[in-house]
A protein has these predicted regions:
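Structural signature for extended repeat/solenoid scaffolds and their inter-repeat hinge/linker regions
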Residues: 1-162, 167-170, 176
């Protein structure tokens, strides 16, 4: 087990990170370690670098200490998941990604799944099979809700509709008030 060190640019440009290895004693040595990802390639792939102080699992290619690889990160009592995901449950439905700033991509992995993207300020996109709706809401109280009842647009202040061409409104009944 290693601990990600303070950021230093990789002197060889190999996308490595400094990792302290406490197993080496009171003054743990640091190694440069490459970072394993589920998908990585030129100009594409996952990019989720651990933060300074995160616990990581370190392996060594062919047992060579010069070829360290961060294989994953670890949770513990001192390094718990973000609030919404801190408590495990038997159902294990709550999944997610939470960034350092609190931005979230979340999943409720139930029979009728829910997917959401949310910012710390309260802007949110919700895809909800349970409530059978798609909702876009913002921190100001504006919303766009699509569900079996139709489409509802709510503006906390003014509402402007602009088109470079024609605007057509049609329906069985139109109520403008």
């Amino acid at each position: 087990i290693g601990v990600v060190g303070v950021f230093e640019a990789d002197p060889d440009g190999e996308q490595r990170m400094r990792v302290l290895l406490p197993v080496l004693g009171e003054d743990p040595g640091a190694v440069w370690a490459r970072l394993a990802m589920p998908h990585a390639g030129t100009e594409h792939g996952f990019v989720f670098r651990p933060e300074t102080g995160d616990e990581v699992i370190v392996g060594f290619l062919d047992g060579d200490p010069r070829q360290a690889v961060i294989l994953g990160a670890l949770y513990s009592s001192a390094n718990a998941p973000a609030g919404d995901y801190a408590e495990a449950s038997e159902e294990n439905n709550d999944k997610g990604i939470v960034t350092r700033s609190g931005a979230k991509i979340g999943f409720v992995d139930a029979d009728r799944p829910v997917v959401f993207i949310e910012t710390p300020a309260g802007n949110r996109l919700l895809l909800d099979d349970d409530q059978e709706q798609l909702a876009l809401t913002d921190q100001h109280g504006n919303s766009l809700i699509l569900n079996a009842d139709g489409i509802a647009v709510t503006s906390a202040a003014d509402l402007a509709i602009e088109a470079s061409g024609e605007v057509r409104i049609s329906g069985q009944s139109i109520d403008l008030s």
